[in-house]
Amino acid sequence: MNSLANPRMRQFALFTVHCLLLTVLAACGSKSDEQPLIAYAPVNLSLNVTNQQYAALRADNGAVTLPVKGPAGDGGVKGVIVVRQSAGVFLAFERNCPYQPYSACALVSLDRPSRLFMRDSCCNSQFDLKGQITGGPTPRPLKQYSTSLQGSLLNITN
């Protein structure tokens, strides 16, 4: 006789399966959940990539830093770093470091000597020019914003 044919055994088996599923789901948290997320701030920037001020964006892997408030518009929590990946492809990242983002010194900048990566000098987190983690305690990559290029006008929004 099949033991699951007994209604009590079937009920017990279902209860056990549900308990196991709940345990597995509860264990799915990660370390990154322990760090607060970067606060929302409006990002609405427009810049002409042919402007001399943004000359670094004329070459692949060229990058510029934009302030929170400036002639280009609103730039997030602590400003935006714009990186040219290739002709017509730009990436834009929040300068607020994902590691302890409410710390006053949580600020990501281009590495001055090389300009080949970005880093937060406060916590020593490092990121490549695609915003991915390459070192340090940060649990997340850089917050990325949307970009669209229309002619020579680059728009950055969230």
List the predicted regions and their residue ranges.
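Bacterial N-terminal signal peptides that target proteins for export
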Residues: 2-17
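N-terminal pre-ligand scaffold of iron-sulfur
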Residues: 31-113, 143-158
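Acidic/polar residues at beta-strand termini and the immediately following turn/coil
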Residues: 46-48, 120, 128
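Short cysteine-rich clusters marking metal-coordination/redox-active sites
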Residues: 97, 119-120
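Short Fe-S-cluster ligation motifs
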Residues: 122-158
